[in-house]
Amino acid sequence: MDTLVMENSAPAQAASSPEFLFTSGQGTLSATDWASLITTPACEWPLLEQQIASALAAARPAGQANPLLIGCLRVRPGGSSCLYVPAAMSGDRPVPAAQAPVTAAMANQVVEANRVISVQSTPPASEFQASVSAALDAFAQGRLAKVVLSRKLTLTLHQPADPTQVMARLMAQNPHAFHFSLPLGQGRRLLGASPELLLRVSEGEVFTHPLARSARRASEPAQEQMVARDLLASRKDQHEHKLVIDEIRRVLTPHCRELAIPSSPSLMSTDTLWHLGTPIAGRLNGGEASVLSLACQLHPTPALCGYPTELARQFIREQEPFRRALFSGIVGWCDSQGNGEWAVVIRCGVLDGHQVELFAGAGIVAGSDPPWSGPRPGTKLGTMLKALGLDLEVAQ
């Protein structure tokens, strides 16, 4: 298991030039230098909590009254997180978007046309269909209620993808998303535009907005209304969404003196999809846990893994032929006072020179039809494909 706290006095190639960027409706946070790197996954929380506390404490003598931790946290075992304590920040909060000139400047850039040399889907469609069938058998036997199976698409491009240009397109095409870009070492970079907030904590107030079940948007207004109406009325989709909400209620209730959860979900849209979402707000008990400790208790929700969680994890390990790495982890920031904001790592990709890895997941419940439940995989991959200047047909 990779666990590491590295000081920047002896930087390694795998952690040089962080150039981290995270944006949300709360503002923009960026950093270009680091004091510490932590790679421990969330499944080792006692060790991770100790390492974070030590790294934040070490940043105070350098002049940071309220140091920040930024980056991406891997939730599942078998791989590394990528968490940084910046060496210096202009403040201890995200800068409001209106004050962040990088946003407007990047959005005006254009991605140059590129050409796909090869495409590899992992797993192939036939193997994915077999995994869905195995999941349906597990549901029928009462062993599982839901599982989320994912697909990786590996593209080889004629020209290397420019991370700055791709990020500009992501921000322009998905202005209300949670945008993120961070280095993974050896020239690799994770970036994306997630529609889903896992958790935000600010001065004792907690907020989460889980998304579960989706449908592809239509180009015609009449059909668009029908798609949205059918999603909101679907018993199967409502059932799957309720699994997520019930689990979040179970986790948050002991930590909150107030917790407001709507009785039914509402519709939320991105540029390609309609989602069922439920905004949940509350107030933490006095002296309660930090945003990151709560996030690690919440994640992975049934929307990212399945239910029951441990059985779904085991099923995924048995069926998926690749490691998800940081895909389906969480990305964001927290400060030394327990405040912060973390989004789910979806609608994302890893850029590595001429090669790009894209990821998409599908929630499977009883009644799902192989090979995919809900939108086609190309629809969820469409966020990154559009930012890369590629056609959606690449993913079909």
Swiss-Prot record:
GO MF, any single term: isochorismate synthase activity
Enzyme Commission number(s): 5.4.4.2
Paired cysteines (S-S): none
Pfam family, one: Chorismate_bind
SUPFAM superfamilies: ADC synthase
Catalytic activity as recorded in UniProt: chorismate = isochorismate
GO BP: biosynthetic process
Family: Belongs to the isochorismate synthase family.
Stated name of the protein: Putative isochorismate synthase
